[in-house]
């Protein structure tokens, strides 16, 4: 997994400004950080496609967009790596912001499913804005691997340290 910046109060404000307020300058910072993270990963790995972590349906409705997919777009275009969206929420999950490691794991256990008709082959990389405990990325990778999709890593804009 590669990330561009450590999660800090400033990074938190930028992520929230992008996610919740559609602040264009914040969007640019997040998508640039994801692009930089992918560039670092590409030095060591061949990547066939990017898979953004999907937002909860309620969050997508509220924001009016699929945030991570949109933030991954510039990296996809720059490196000519297609975005694929086979991950779906198979059940309702709570907002993770107030949960500890065990709470996040319990919240996400079995939460993702894969659209079986996608037929993806090759090396996939997950994309998210922030990794705090790794629970989201672990659960997404589990669902994808169960569906036969090879996940070789993940890129995020920010990394919380220590992982909570």
Where are these regions (language model features)?
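PRPP-dependent phosphoribosyltransferase catalytic core
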Residues: 138-164
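Structural beta-sheet core signal
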Residues: 85-86, 126, 153-156
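Short glycine/serine/threonine/alanine-rich loop segments
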Residues: 80-81, 149
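Active-site-facing substrate-recognition patch
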Residues: 1-49, 56-77, 83-121, 158-164
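A phosphate-binding catalytic loop at a beta-strand-loop-alpha-helix junction
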Residues: 126-140
């Amino acid at each position: 997994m590669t990330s561009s910046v450590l999660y800090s109060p400033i990074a938190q404000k930028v992520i929230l400004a992008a996610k919740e307020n559609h602040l264009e300058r914040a969007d640019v910072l997040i998508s640039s950080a994801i692009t930089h993270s992918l560039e670092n990963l590409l030095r060591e790995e061949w990547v066939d496609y990017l898979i953004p972590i999907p937002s909860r349906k309620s969050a997508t409705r509220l924001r009016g967009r699929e945030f991570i997919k949109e933030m991954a777009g510039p990296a996809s275009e720059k490196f000519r790596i297609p975005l694929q969206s086979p991950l779906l929420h198979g059940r309702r999950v709570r907002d993770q912001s107030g949960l500890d490691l065990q709470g996040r794991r319990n919240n996400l256990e079995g939460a993702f499913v894969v659209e079986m008709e996608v037929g993806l082959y090759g090396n996939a990389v997950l994309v998210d804005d922030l990794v705090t405990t790794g629970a989201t990325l672990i659960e997404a990778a589990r669902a994808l691997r169960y569906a036969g999709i090879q996940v070789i890593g993940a890129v995020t804009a920010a990394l919380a340290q220590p992982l909570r």
